[in-house]
Amino acid sequence: MSQMKFAFTTVVAAGLLSLSPAVAHADDAPLNIHGFGILNLQNDYITPRGLFVTGKGETVQVIDGLVFGLNHDPAATIDDISFTVGTFNDIYTDQHAKTAGSWNEFDWFAGPSFHFARDWNLDVQIGQFLSPPGNFNAETNLEFALSFDDSKLGLPFLLKPYVKLFYAISGDSTVVTGAKGGTFDVEIGAAPTFDLSPYHIPLKISAPTWITVGPADFWGGTDNVGVFSTGLTVTYPLPITPRLGHWNAKAGFQYYNFLNPKLRFAQTLLGTASPGSGGHQDEVNGFLGLSFGF
């Protein structure tokens, strides 16, 4: 699943904090529901855990969901609680499956978010990765993402640090060669972001960067490190009336270094590298995107 799902749902959930206590607790207050959508055109499909899924043609990825505000109390330690449900779809232009055509993957995810101690956020999501053409058996997983809001530190840019625990419950290995359930990896990362709007330039530049580590059986070998990734994303807020939501266009690239030899071996099994070649050590994935939230 795309890394951007976590980032976007965190941003939408954070927006719920702007509600006043009167609005949040009034008996006649309207339902506090927000939504989001992301459309990306990419030259590759590479998962956050470093699985190089597709490399020929292009891939279109669509993420959408709803965020339900459940409770908002600025005086409480846990000052905001919300619940997110959503889906992820991958459309691979070079796939021509008899039963699914170019529909390569369908995922669903759901879970609560807790904002606490003023600057911390914990997202908990259960989900499944499904293969419409039957390339793999359903993969059920549980993910915990802890992030810190460093906007109050007074730095000229935001670091946006986070750590994620991805636990594979059952089904096929999410990296092909690893254990089928009962294992995990940890993603340690940050998304340094520089906002140029104070300089009258309507752009944000971010550099999403992470590394994955975990027990060797997650990849099926003897190494405890998975993938290192870094890149640049330029985001432009589209001048669309707020009544239609908040829209952004973006472009950028993400570099991946497949540190674990099992990730490189998996490429030869999936066809993104030639059999016996040893796989690609690294890859750059370019993308264009459109997102909205309300």
Q: What are the functions of these language-model segments?
A:
Residues 25-34, 69-84, 96-100, 115-121, ...:
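Short loop/turn motifs that connect adjacent beta-strands in outer-membrane beta-barrel proteins
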Residues 207, 216, 232-294:
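Predominantly the C-terminal beta-signal and adjacent terminal strand-loop region
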Residues 1-34:
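Cleavable N-terminal export/targeting peptides
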Residues 47-54, 95-104, 134-141, 171-180, ...:
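Outer-membrane beta-barrel translocator domains and adjoining extracellular loop/strand segments
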Residues 41-47, 68, 87-93, 114, ...:
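Transmembrane beta-strands of outer-membrane beta-barrel pores
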